[in-house]
């Protein structure tokens, strides 16, 4: 199995290439100008300044919070990984259009992998790609070709990209672990996914917001073997 991950994907999407792709799709000039304004908003100076302020405030909050040292280190490590925007690069984080544009940006790569490379077992969500094949040499060839295509998009693969054998431990993807046992697929939750969910719920004090967030996670957890974790969430809610 080949698992690919793109380095700082949301912050690295090239405006020029993205707008060129969109120009063949969006015929309405007014709509195109609006989309261009949204995309180019990351070029504004105040964006990085505000991002720096948010990180600074968040660090201050973490230092003075009552969470244990391990959680503090984890939070600070995540903050340290947040990059700043370069001119002509990146999509505004949190914007609904960014989700759609991020999926669209690699659309041609999807077709290349399926139609040119002939990969039958292929999955992608945003910048997480998985190719499954019994021949590792074939996957090496695919990786070489994918690297070239990604480079043409002014992106790069990160260190998480690798080819490895699918064992009885399965493989992680989108917060789950997929395991094949006795010809049956089991979907398990990763430990860090559980911690992230519980940490998020712990922060919510308002009952209405808690219930809304709980229902959202319930939908996410349904595909997985998660009855035990759902019970744990319920117990924490009752406290």
Q: Language-model segments: what does each one mean?
A:
Residues 50, 152-154, 237:
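Acidic/proline-rich low-complexity IDRs
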Residues 78-88, 137-140, 157-239:
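Right-hand nucleic-acid polymerase module
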Residues 1-126, 130-145, 165:
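Conserved polymerase palm-domain catalytic core
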Residues 26, 147-155:
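A common structural junction motif
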Residues 119, 152-154, 160:
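A generic structural signal for alpha->beta connector loops
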